[in-house]
Amino acid sequence: MQLSWKDIPTVAPANDLLDIVLNRTQRKTPTVIRPGFNITRIRAFYMRKVKFTGEGFVEKFDDILKGFPNINDVHPFHRDLMDTLYEKNHFKVSLAAVSRAKTLVEQVERDYTRLLKFGQSLFQCKQLKRAALGRMATIVKKLKDPLVYLEQVRQHLGRMPSIDPNTRTLLICGYPNVGKSSFLRCITKADVEVQPYAFTTKSLYVGHFDYKYLRFQAIDTPGILDRPTDEMNNVEMQSIYAIAHLRSTVMYFMDLSEQCGFSIEAQVKLFHSIKPLFANKSVMVVINKTDIIKPEDLDEERKKLLDTVLEVPGVEIMTTSCHEEDNVMAVRNKACEKLLASRIENKLKSQARITNVLNKIHVAQPQKRDDGIDRTPYIPEAIAKMKKYDPEDPNRRKLAKEIEIENGGAGVYNVNLKDKYLLEDDEWKNDVMPEILDGKNVYDFLDPEIAIKLQALEEEEERLESEGFYESDEEETYEGFDADEISEIREKAEWIRDRQKKMINASRNRKALKNRGTMPRSKLAKTYGDMEKHMSSLGHDMTALQDKQRVAAEKNRYEQTGADVVYGDQEDSAPAGKLRQTDRLTDGVADGSMRSKAERMAKLERRERNRMARAGESDRHATASLPKHLFSGKRGVGKTDFR
C-alpha cells in the first residue's frame, strides 16, 4: 500500500508543456526538406513530425495520470483526507480533463497521419502538419487551470507526512492549546511548532519512537471545537478522519487550568460528543499542565464532572506535565501497553486466521465397510511392547547425544554414520566403497547374487563353446554352389568393391573442384599418356603410336653444348633438359580474345575498389563520414571555432 506520494513528477503549466514538447520535436526530428524530394519522402518527413509531437504530449499526460493516486484505491483514511484537503470531485475532474486531452491528442495524431498519406505536394503536407500541431496546442492550452491545480496538489502531497493506517499508533487529540504538540515533542524527535496560542497545529504531524523493540507512530492532530461536523473546517476534519479510520490508542488531552481558553465543562462535553468515534479503540484521558493545577485541587462539582468520562468502558485517566516533563514516559508506556493488549485481543477474537489454519488440516478417518467390521488402527507388537524412554532408567537405550557427551562433546567426537548399516558381516560396515570405478557408477552393478549369476554365465559360455556354437565353416556359406560359381561370385564382389572405391574418389574430386574455376573440356590440355590409357581401355593396340612418340621425343631432346660442359660442375643435379618458364597470367586463358576480355573484367572490378580507396576485396573498413577535427563546432560565419 502506498503511504506517501513524494515521487510524482512535476506538472508543468500549459504554456511550458507546449514549449517542452515542441522544442523536443524540433531537436529530435529532421529539419531539412525540399520540394524536389520524392513525395513519399516528404510525406514521411511530416508524418514523423506529427507522430513525434503526439507521442510527446501523450507521454507527458501519462506521467501525470500514473503519478497521482487513484482516490478510489487508497486507504479510506487517505481518501477522506484528500477529499477534505483537495475536494475529491475537483481532483477527479482535473485528472479526467487530462485523460480526455490525451485521447483527443491521440485522435488528432491518427487523423492527420491518415491525411498526410495522401498529400500531393510539400506545401500541402506542411499545412497539414501545421494544422495538426495547432490543434494539439489548442487542446493543451485548454488544460491551463487543471494543470495549475494539479501542480498545487502535487506540492501539498509531497509535504504530507507518511502515515501508515495499519501500524501501532498513538493518536493525540483534544481542544486547541491543551499541550498536544508539546507531548509529541517529549516522546518523539518530531520538530513540531509549539506556541502559546490556539490552532498552532493546522495539519497532521507524525513522530516515531520505539517501545519494547517495536516501532510506534504518534500523530498530533489539530485542535477540535465542540460543534457539528457540518460546521467544522478542513483543519478540524483532519482530526475527525484520523480518529475515525486509524486503529490506535486515542489520547484525549485536557487542560484543567483552563489556560487554553476553554472550560472543563466544554472539554468534557467535547469528549462525549466524539465518543462514537472511539468504537473498537482503547481510550485514555490525559490531564496535562499538572504543574499549574492537579485534579485533587478541583472542587467537588468539577470532580464529578471529570469522573463522567470514566463511564465509558475501558477509559483511564492519567496526569502529566509536559512543561516539567513529569510522568510523560509513564503515560506513553501505559498507552503503548493498552494498544498492544487491544491488538492481541482483536487477533484472538477474529476467526479468520483460525479458519485459514483449520482449512489446511484434514484428519483421515477409515470408513466402515459393508461387512460391518470395525477397522481399528494396527500397531505392531514390537512397538506396543517397546519400553518408554526414561532418562532415570540405568538400563535405558543410550541416545546419540549421550554418547557424544561421554566421548568429549561436540567438536571432539565424530558420529559414525555407518554404525546402523545392515550387512551380513559387521566388519564390512567401515569398508571404503568407491562411488565411481573405471568411469562407471559402482551402485549400478551392486547385486546380492552377482557371484551366482557370474558363475552361471561362465558355465553357459563353456557349454556353447564345446557345442561349436561360435565355429563358422566357410564351405557352409557356399553350400549348394559349385567351384566355378563360387569363383564368379568372388570376382563380382571384388569388382563391386573396386567400383565403390572409384565412385567415392570421383565424388571427393568433384567436391574439391567445387570452389575452383572450371575450364571447358575443349580447352583443357591433353597428354599422350592420357590418350594411350584411354585407347588401351577401349581395346586398341598403341604399339605403333608409342614408336612414333619415342622418335618425336628424340628430335626434341636438348642438345648439350660446350657451355653446358664448362658450367655443368656448378650444379649438383642438372636437369635432363631445359624447362620453359610459363606465364601464369595466360595459363588459364584459351586465346587472345578471351585474354582481353578477362583483362577488361579485372579492370572494371578494380575500378570500384580504387574509387573507394580500398586495399583489396577484403578491405571493409568504414571511415568517419564527418571527421570530428574538421566538423566539430565549426560555423560558417566564423563566430565559433570550438564547443
Swiss-Prot record:
SUPFAM superfamilies: P-loop containing nucleoside triphosphate hydrolases (SSF52540). Residues 168-340 form the OBG-type G domain. It is found in: Nucleus, Nucleolus. One of its GO terms (biological process) is ribosome biogenesis. It holds the Pfam family NOG1. GO terms for cellular component: nucleolus. GO terms for molecular function: GTP binding. GTP binds at residues 174-181, 220-224, 288-291. The keyword Disulfide bond does not apply. It comes from the Eukaryota. Residues 594-622 have a biased composition (Basic and acidic residues). Keywords: GTP-binding, Nucleotide-binding, Nucleus, Ribosome biogenesis. Gene3D superfamilies: 1.20.120.1190, P-loop containing nucleotide triphosphate hydrolases. Residues 568-643 are annotated as: Disordered. Involved in the biogenesis of the 60S ribosomal subunit. Belongs to the TRAFAC class OBG-HflX-like GTPase superfamily. OBG GTPase family. NOG subfamily. This is Nucleolar GTP-binding protein 1. It comes from Kluyveromyces lactis (strain ATCC 8585 / CBS 2359 / DSM 70799 / NBRC 1267 / NRRL Y-1140 / WM37) (Yeast). The gene is NOG1.
